[in-house]
Design a protein with these regions (language model features):
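A short, surface-exposed loop/turn module that caps and links secondary-structure elements
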Residues: 28-56
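Solvent-exposed, charged helical/coil patches
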Residues: 3-31
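Enriched for short, Lys/Arg-rich terminal
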Residues: 3-4, 12, 23, 38, ...
Length: 100
C-alpha cells in the first residue's frame, strides 16, 4: 500500500478545481494508487517524475514522484493545455523539496 503526501501547490490546485466530477475522478485515481498500487494511465516526464493522466474533460494531469518505495509525493496538477508548464513546475517543486 502506498501513502501519499501532497505539496501546498497540489493542494491549492485541487481545491481551486471547479469541475466537481473531474475532482472526484482525480481523487478516485489517487485513492486507487494508495490502496491498490495501481498507476493506470501513467508515463515518465523526466527526472523521475511521472504524469498520472485522467482522460476526462480537459485531460487532467497529476505529477508525482515516488520516495522511499512506498510514498507518493503529489507535486502539482494541471490540464493537457498547460502540460509543458506544469512539468517544469513539478520539477522545480521536487528540487525545492530535496533541497530542504
Amino acid at each position: 500500500m502506498f501513502r501519499t503526501e501532497k505539496t501546498v501547490e497540489f493542494d491549492k490546485w485541487i481545491r481551486k478545481l471547479k469541475d466537481i466530477r473531474a475532482k472526484a475522478k482525480i481523487l478516485f485515481r489517487i485513492q486507487k494508487l494508495e490502496t491498490d498500487e495501481h498507476f493506470g494511465d501513467c508515463k515518465p516526464v523526466g527526472d523521475g517524475i511521472r504524469e498520472l493522466r485522467i482522460n476526462y474533460a480537459k485531460g487532467y494531469r497529476v505529477y508525482f514522484k515516488e520516495k522511499d518505495d512506498k510514498i507518493i509525493v503529489l507535486l502539482i496538477g494541471g490540464e493537457k493545455s498547460s502540460q509543458q508548464k506544469d512539468i517544469k513546475k513539478a520539477k522545480e517543486i521536487w528540487k525545492k523539496i530535496n533541497k530542504d
